[in-house]
């Protein structure tokens, strides 16, 4: 035990009441932090960091916490909130809590009770807590009536996270992140979302939720094996009136999504990705193309496109009813195409593509591509194509260079 204090020792109690920061690292035999009898005297703690305390079973936390980071505590199964008044009921509010990180807590099943509020929470990181099926505890009504149980949703519809800006959920057994009927302001300030190694995740954005993410700037999806579509645009609840889809998104990275077949299950009816700058698609083996020609017109600010190790990709931009457009990716600066065995060309539709800012092209192991485009491509700043990390080739334009590479595979 860390604080094994007799409640009659006034000087020790006075010091404990002044404690506002507690950092515990590498204490493998620590089983308890404080006596249960005096735990309420530990209620002014604002910063709590606990790492590698393998034997710690329960953890008391105060309501005035600002930062909580718990890592590699294998025996920890419960977090207990200290109330100023014993027997207090009703909602518990963490009015100052801004950052929460829960990592490698294999036995943690309860992080917070159902009646809890986080009006200031900005950053939440949860990684490898396999027993934690939901962020807050189930209500008694859900426990008594299984038909009301929304346990498939990691964030229940009763929880509001209206200040959350950064969310990491990694290596969690979660099927659905958020309930479509969660509070209307919840997640509306989210700027960065990272979902990694969530092997049961079925979807990310439903039609009722996607309208909330107007501030999202960075989206990373990695190793979510059951994820077949990122954006579900129909089939959940009626969509809200929306003028743009993800208008502030600047970086989209998707990798190792083995079942991903498309971005969305229905053609978007509103403009999307208007501020997207960087797009990275890696090891998505069921994708055959990225966008249709008309869809690609939305990506007017795209500067970097990296498409690698996608076994079934045949073209980057798919045919779109014979439409010819000359303004695809006008801001493009860097294009990387690597390990795409079935890629035939960038786009099969005719028309002159104008890429006045393109400066870097890297290609490697694209054996099926005979020419980059059917027609001309204007790239005034492009002077070479990287065919290895350092080796370059150039025959006057991109089409001729790609064609030469196809006819001379050992180049």
Which positions does each model-derived feature cover?
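Cross-kingdom leucine-rich repeat
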Residues: 1-411
């Amino acid at each position: 035990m860390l604080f094994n204090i007799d409640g009659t020792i006034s000087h020790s109690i006075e010091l404990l009441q002044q404690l506002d920061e507690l950092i515990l690292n590498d204490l493998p035999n620590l089983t308890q932090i404080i006596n249960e009898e005096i735990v309420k005297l530990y209620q002014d703690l604002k910063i709590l960091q606990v790492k590698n305390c393998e034997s710690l079973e329960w953890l008391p936390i105060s309501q005035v916490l600002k930062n909580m980071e718990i890592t590699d505590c294998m025996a920890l199964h419960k977090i207990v909130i200290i109330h100023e008044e014993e027997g207090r009921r009703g909602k518990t509010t963490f009015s100052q809590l801004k950052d929460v990180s829960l990592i490698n807590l294999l036995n943690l099943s309860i992080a917070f009770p159902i009646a809890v509020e986080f009006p200031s929470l900005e950053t939440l990181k949860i990684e490898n807590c396999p027993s934690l099926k939901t962020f807050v505890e189930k209500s008694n009504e859900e426990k008594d009536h299984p038909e009301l149980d929304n346990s498939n949703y990691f964030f229940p519809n009763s929880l509001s996270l209206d200040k959350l800006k950064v969310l990491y959920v990694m290596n969690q057994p979660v099927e659905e992140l958020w309930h479509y009927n969660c509070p209307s302001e919840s997640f509306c300030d989210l700027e960065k979302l990272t979902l990694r190694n969530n092997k049961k995740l079925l979807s990310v954005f439903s039609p009722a939720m996607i309208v909330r993410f107007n501030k999202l700037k960075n989206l990373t999806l990695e190793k979510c094996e059951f994820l077949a579509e990122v954006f579900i645009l129909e089939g959940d609840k009626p969509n809200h009136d929306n003028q743009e889809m993800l208008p502030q998104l600047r970086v989209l990275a998707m990798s190792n999504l083995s079942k991903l077949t498309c971005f969305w299950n229905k053609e978007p009816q509103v403009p999307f990705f208007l501020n997207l700058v960087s797009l990275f698609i890696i090891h998505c083996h069921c994708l055959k193309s990225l966008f249709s020609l008309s869809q690609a017109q939305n990506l007017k600010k795209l500067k970097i496109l990296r498409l690698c190790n996608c076994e079934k990709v045949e073209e980057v931009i798919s045919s779109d009813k014979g439409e010819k457009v000359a303004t695809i990716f006008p801001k493009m600066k860097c294009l990387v195409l690597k390990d795409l065995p079935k890629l035939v060309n960038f786009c099969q539709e005719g028309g002159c593509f104008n890429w006045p800012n393109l400066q870097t092209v890297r290609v490697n192991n694209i054996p099926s591509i005979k020419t980059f485009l059917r027609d001309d491509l204007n790239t005034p700043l492009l002077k070479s194509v990287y065919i290895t990390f350092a080796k370059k080739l150039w025959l006057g334009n991109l089409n001729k260079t790609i064609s030469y590479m196809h006819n001379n595979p050992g180049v």
